[in-house]
Amino acid sequence: MKIELAIIFIVLAAGAGFLIGNLLRKKLSDSLVSKAEELASRIVEDAKREAETISKEAALQAKDVVYQAKADFEREAKEKHKDLQTLEKRLQQKEENLDKKMNLFDQRDADLTKKEQGILAREQSLNRKEESLDALVAEQRAKLEQISGMSSAEAKKILMDAMESEAKLDAAKRIKAIEEEARETADKKSKEIISLAVQRYAGEYVAEKTVSVVALPSDEMKGRIIGREGRNIRALEAATGIDLIIDDTPEAVILSGFNPVRREVAKIALEKLITDGRIHPGRIEEVVAKAEEEVEQAVKEAGDQAAFDLGVHGIHPEILKLIGRLKYRTSYSQNVYQHSLEVAFLCGIMASELGINVKQAKRAGLLHDLGKAVDHEVEGSHAVIGAELARKYGESPKIVHAIMAHHEDEKPNSILAVLVQAADALSGARPGARREMMETYVKRLEDLERISCSFGGVNNSFAIQAGREIRVMVSSEEVSDERAVLLAKDIAKKIEAEMTYPGQIKVNVIRETRAIEYAR
């Protein structure tokens, strides 16, 4: 490229010089023309020399490029050759390794073939020996049968019987040892669990009484409570079934009755009447009805509170109401509501120690005495009644079984049922929890009411005066005055036949006729 430029440059310079010479020749004198020609000649010479220099430099640069390209090519060729040699060596090594492995495999194959032949030969030898031994055993067995007079089957049976007897004896000894060890361990563990449960829960309890005291603002209120010819006190006793004892006790009226629900109703009603000041039979019936509603509300709240305290949920509202009614029930003077809570807590503690469902254990403990909330009109033990109620209101079969089995009405077949039994015994049998005399007294009063209500035409009955009198309220439409006399005798005879009691019991049959009309 530089050579071409040099040639072009020379041509242009020559042309320029020629033109300049012509111009100078025409315009200048001959001297000037000659000088111009000399100048042009020098310019041409300079251009030639420069062109030669450029040409030489270009040739040298071309040689350098060719040399560098050749050197690069030779270097790359050497590197590729080296890589090929390395790859060739690697392939050669792999080939040698494969040859060695093939030789090793061939040797192993030969060894295996040799061993297989040896095993076959040994197997044939063993088969021959086995046949020989079988023949020898058969020969010896025949000789033994001939000498002993027993067949091989008989001898085998005798041997098996002896071994079986020995095995049974060993197994029986082992089982007995295991049972004793398990019994000792279980007894120790159960004592630990029960003692821990008793230590962790210590419920407070005050023995129930059969009387309530209502404070009066003054002794003058006693006369108003009695009313003209005693009509107010009779109306209150008839409406509540509770004895009102008005004696010399200053500014107080004593309510006596074994049924805590009725006694609570009577107490609330009397307090309202005293506060209101209007005391007459019509007002008494109205206030008693309101008091019964308040007690029912208190019953519902007590059931809800029990479930909340224990952390058990999903209990049917009717069951919660029955649990609340247990607050007004006693068993050997022990409040059944508090007893149920105590059993539930004890069940939960023992269940946590045993690693079973704590919520389920608390639920079973809370509901175990549910049947005691039902009045005596329903026949059956409280365990059976409670189980039926639990089943009716959707409790699980495990809970139903635990309720049914806690007094052995059904054999307990689950850990939960046994836990409820244990917790029930812990709560009831601890010192000071119950009093036998109180329960016997209440049972006698309940039997009096049960016997009285078993006759037709009886609306209600109330055992009063500490069980020395039973008031029987009859329907005026079903029982006439003459029939009332006979009914009193029949009730008295049945009480004499079925009950044992000190002194005598007064049977008072009350037949009331009401005529109601409205003035408009």
Curated annotation (Swiss-Prot):
Q: Which gene encodes it?
A: rny
UniProt entry keywords in alphabetical sequence: Cell membrane, Endonuclease, Hydrolase, Membrane, Nuclease, RNA-binding, Transmembrane, Transmembrane helix
State the annotated membrane topology for this chain. Single-pass membrane protein
Which species is the source of this protein? Geobacter sulfurreducens (strain ATCC 51573 / DSM 12127 / PCA)
**Role of this protein:** Endoribonuclease that initiates mRNA decay.
The protein's location, in the record's own words, is: Cell membrane
Q: Where is the HD domain?
A: 336-429
Instruction: List residues of the KH domain.
Output: 210-273
Q: What class of enzyme is it?
A: hydrolase
In its UniProt record, which GO terms are filed under biological process? Answer: mRNA catabolic process
Q: Does the keyword Transit peptide apply?
A: no
- For this protein, what is the EC number? 3.1.-.-
Transmembrane intervals? 3-23
Task: State the name under which the record lists this protein.
Answer: Ribonuclease Y
Q: Per its UniProt record, what PANTHER family does this chain match?
A: RIBONUCLEASE Y
User: Which HAMAP family does the UniProt record give?
Assistant: RNase_Y
Q: Which GO terms describe its cellular component?
A: plasma membrane
What the entry lists under Pfam families is as follows: HD (PF01966), KH_1 (PF00013), RNase_Y_N (PF12072)
